[in-house]
Amino acid sequence: MNTFPAPAKLNLFLHVIGRRDDGYHLLQTVFRFIGYSDQLGFDVTNDGVIRHLNLVPGLTDTDDLCVRAAKLLQKRSGKEMLGVGIHLSKNIPLGGGLGGGSSDAATTLIVLNRLWGINWGRERLMALGLELGADVPIFIYGRNAFAEGVGEKLEVINLPPAWYVVLTPPAPISTAAVFASRELTRNTIPIKMAAFSMAQGHNDLELVAMRLQPVIAEWLDWLKGRHGSTKVAMSGSGSCVFAEFPSESAAREVLRQLPDSMSGFIAPGLARHPLSDF
């Protein structure tokens, strides 16, 4: 069984600039892929059955975005006679704001599009992915991007090489709970990316997430106390926090200082999704 990567993403900033009539929030953010991935294997069958061969603890078939993605693609493409067994090796933490579930769904769509002989273009796959979640399209798009709308309006952005220290507090957060908070700022002034410095950006979800899980503030403060970082922030709706460094050696030195009571990893920023040309 061949395996395929489903990389994590970071939101280098995340501004909430409004809310649509249907309740969805309007965002501006920059997505960056990092070299830290789940791994998925696919065993194509001819029985029309979609199976998850090793369901992740804490997830049901209903919650499993890989299975949902496969079933949606199977139905819309008319490939009901084809099935698949999906094996997921999970590395990206659940509820961490790193897009793990969305990335798994995107890799499922990208790979089965090829293995099932559907061969749709990326735009069609992105539209299908949006039905599964607002973060799924960026992983199908395959490039670091400035995103607007609910996260589906994407524009390629070229980012300099960087390394990231990502801390993983044991405090998963519900994205829905963060966005539902009355304390959430929803009126950040929209920016034009061409005239914007990444260092100016912030994450409007941080304060709400820190109230829901105070440990996030403690881990974020620890990162802010390290020297040499060019940016420190929370990713997505949390709970993971990160610091950006210009070199691998600088990132490794900070990880070396990490107290035993904390957990995390380092990863390089990627120029594009590893399956961008698949």
Swiss-Prot record:
EC number: 2.7.1.148
Pfam families named among the record's database cross-references: GHMP_kinases_C (PF08544), GHMP_kinases_N (PF00288)
InterPro entries listed in its UniProt record: GHMP_kinase_C_dom, GHMP_kinase_C_sf, GHMP_kinase_N_dom, IspE, Ribosomal_Su5_D2-typ_SF, Ribsml_uS5_D2-typ_fold_subgr
Alphabetical keyword list: ATP-binding, Isoprene biosynthesis, Kinase, Nucleotide-binding, Transferase
Residues reported to bind ATP: P93, L94, G95, G96, G97, L98, G99, G100, G101, S102, S103
Active-site annotation: K9, D135
GO molecular function terms attached to this record: 4-(cytidine 5'-diphospho)-2-C-methyl-D-erythritol kinase activity; ATP binding
Catalytic activity entry: 4-CDP-2-C-methyl-D-erythritol + ATP = 4-CDP-2-C-methyl-D-erythritol 2-phosphate + ADP + H(+)
Pathway as given in its UniProt record: Isoprenoid biosynthesis; isopentenyl diphosphate biosynthesis via DXP pathway; isopentenyl diphosphate from 1-deoxy-D-xylulose 5-phosphate: step 3/6
GO terms (BP aspect): isopentenyl diphosphate biosynthetic process, methylerythritol 4-phosphate pathway; terpenoid biosynthetic process
Keyword Kinase listed: yes
Known role: Catalyzes the phosphorylation of the position 2 hydroxy group of 4-diphosphocytidyl-2C-methyl-D-erythritol.
Family named by the database record: Belongs to the GHMP kinase family. IspE subfamily.
UniProt xrefs under NCBIfam families: ispE, PRK14608.1
Protein name: 4-diphosphocytidyl-2-C-methyl-D-erythritol kinase
Lineage: Bacteria, Pseudomonadati, Pseudomonadota, Betaproteobacteria, Nitrosomonadales
